[in-house]
From Swiss-Prot:
Domain of life (superkingdom): Bacteria
SUPFAM superfamilies per UniProt: Ribosomal protein S6
Family annotation (Pfam families): Ribosomal_S6
Lineage: Bacteria, Pseudomonadati, Pseudomonadota, Betaproteobacteria, Burkholderiales
Gene that this polypeptide is encoded by: rpsF
Keywords: Ribonucleoprotein, Ribosomal protein, RNA-binding, rRNA-binding
Entry protein name: Small ribosomal subunit protein bS6
CDD domains reported in the protein's UniProt record: bS6
One Gene Ontology term of the molecular function aspect: small ribosomal subunit rRNA binding
Amino acid sequence: MRHYEIILLIHPDQSEQVPAMLERYKGMIAAGGGKVHRVEDWGRRQLAYLINKLSKAHYLCVNIEADQAVMAELEHAFKFNDAVLRHLTVHKKKAVTGPSAMMKTVEREEFRKASQAGNQTTAPAASPADHAAAPASADRS
């Protein structure tokens, strides 16, 4: 069996259906005797260019171990699923189980947003009235 990394771009209106789609694809892999090593949901992200008049897509990364028959079945399922805008399958030399560079970026962005939200709730922002009530700085002569 060979190791593969699959990147899927899902229609943004179908984001709620992503877990069901993943379970269906995992079932196809397991039925063929393969294994799923890693599943990463990168969420909705901006596309570099329009695809089917869409500027955003829901990204998924799946690392699997499967034989060629299972891969052919998966490729066929991706091709005829209208929710899958694009897919890319890359052959890997070994199983990849650690977080990808993209997932580390996603986690970093989530941490930054959470810390900003925490800072905004603890330190209230200065209102325009506060600036008007502040004493004037040194007069110019």
